[in-house]
Design a protein with these regions (language model features):
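A conserved beta-strand-loop-helix scaffold within acyl/acetyltransferase catalytic domains
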Residues: 1-20, 27
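A short, internal acetyl-CoA/4′-phosphopantetheine-binding micro-motif in the GNAT/acyltransferase core
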Residues: 2, 25-37
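A conserved beta-turn-beta hairpin within the catalytic core of GNAT-like acetyltransferases
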Residues: 15-25, 34, 55-57
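Conserved acetyl-CoA-binding loop-helix of GNAT-fold acetyltransferases
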Residues: 35-49, 72
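Conserved GNAT acetyl-CoA-binding A-motif
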Residues: 52-62
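Conserved beta-strand-loop-alpha-helix junction that forms the acyl-donor binding cleft
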Residues: 61-71
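Conserved catalytic-core motifs of GNAT/GCN5-like acyltransferases
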Residues: 62, 80-95
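C-terminal "cap" of GNAT-fold acetyltransferases
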Residues: 88-126, 132-134
Length: 154
């Protein structure tokens, strides 16, 4: 939550501890949060826990090949494109859609971590944020929204 309002969701799925892999997905955010700090901050927390606490070897993310915003957001996280899964799932309208597959492996994590920390700066204390009650990061005085120094954030 931000300012005690739900702003979206992202989650672990397909966790396979024996193989040291998981997927991060089921991500959606309120339009007001698109292009802001929420996605990189949330992904930082999930990736940090996956690699540094859980000891995962690999994390994966997928996006519908028609969803350029999601593809761009995943790419900006530092994930590597691995290929397209053709006809991978049924869309809500009943059509088949292709899913683009991305990953971050443990050897990528230090560079990805540093890139995410740079993007979410000045929120360097992201792992100590109180997501349930909001936090006092730099705010736009008119709207109370989180703002950055102009770095692309999504």
């Amino acid at each position: 939550t931000i300012n005690n309002a739900v702003c979206g969701s992202t989650a672990y799925c397909g966790v396979d501890e024996a193989q040291g892999r998981l997927e991060i997905g089921r991500t959606f955010y309120d339009r007001a949060q698109w292009g802001r700090v929420v996605n990189p901050a949330c992904k930082f927390l999930l990736l940090e826990y996956a690699f540094e606490t859980w000891g995962m070897y690999r994390t994966a993310m997928r996006a519908d090949s028609r969803n350029s915003r999601s593809i761009s957001a995943i790419t900006r996280l530092g994930a590597t494109y691995e290929g397209t899964l053709r006809g991978f799932r049924l869309a809500p309208d009943g059509s088949r859609c292709d899913s683009m597959s991305f990953s971050i492996v443990h050897t990528d994590w230090p560079v990805v971590r540093d890139g995410l920390l740079t993007r979410i700066d000045p929120l360097r204390a992201v792992s100590q944020m109180d997501w349930d009650t909001g936090f006092d990061a730099r705010r736009n005085s008119a709207a109370g929204d989180l703002v950055s120094d102009g770095a692309p954030e999504d």
